[in-house]
Amino acid sequence: MKKIYKRLLFSGLALSMLFFLSGCVQMKNGKPTGEGWVYKFFAAPMGSVIQYLANNLGLGFGFAIIIVTVIVRLLILPLGLSQVRKMTYQSEKMAYLKPVFDPIQERMKNAKTQEEKMAAQTELMQAQRHYGMSMFGGLGCLPLLIQMPFFSALYISTRYTKGIASASFLGIKLGSPNMIITVIIGILYLVQSWVSTLSVPEAQRQQTRNMMFMMPIMMVMISIGAPAGGALYWLVSGIFGLIQQLITNHIIKPKLRKQIDEEFKKNPPKPFKSNARKDITPQANNDKKLITSKKQKSNRNAGKQRHHKQ
């Protein structure tokens, strides 16, 4: 489940940043003004390449969009795979250390007092640091930040490059929304989500399948009102996402499992002893001593008062 949550978090963050970076392109009357760093340094050059392929080489805007998208996605594919590798390494290592973390999480869940909950949280953080685990499961931001200007520029250039709005591709008007491309995008991202569940343990697979419709629905909602030129970008990106997921399932993940097994065989995890519980016990003992001291003092004062009355 945590792995799926991280994937959804990653996808949601990517989409949010995409639209945020789209805001770096200044618009007027629904068209780019030519200002904004994303447009100047990324979208405009990509648009020029699209026009060159479409007009000078006679490939047409549809194939030009596909070619430029493929080239850019291939260039940033190593970054995407590096991101996936880090996330997968952390999740696989977490699965290996599940017997260590589960009891702590169970204590945190069943804590009856705020002190017990805080102690369990502290113990969990100490255990994560002890075993070299990241709280965010390897969800580093640098590869994502590097990729997002390219994603945003591709989307802008496929929507607003001059000539695309009036062009056609395989009988599809690139300047208007197209239901066929939208349906294909929905199916493609659904397959991608389904493939991602294949690497999940059988016990958790049913839960993950209930969540795998979120990304396809999100992509359909984005594509259904977008011009076909922009939707074509999402379609090609979906194909790359599926390829990346297959590489993860059949190459990266088995290799990392073998690597982690060898790491733990050579250097078995040392037993973790937390001092989080000890942080509360002395305080409790001090409180008891303070209460006892107050009672004894009160009893002595009461005895003196009785003696005085006598």
UniProtKB/Swiss-Prot annotation:
Residue numbers spanned by region Disordered: 263-310
Compositional bias ranges of the Basic and acidic residues kind: 276-290
Annotated signal sequence range: 1-23
Protein's name in the database: Membrane protein insertase YidC 2
Biased composition (Basic residues): 291-310
GO molecular function, one term: membrane insertase activity
Record-linked NCBIfam families: PRK02463.1, yidC_oxa1_cterm
PROSITE patterns: PROKAR_LIPOPROTEIN
Chief place of localization: membrane
Membrane topology: Multi-pass membrane protein
Pfam families documented for this protein: 60KD_IMP
Subcellular locations according to the entry: Cell membrane
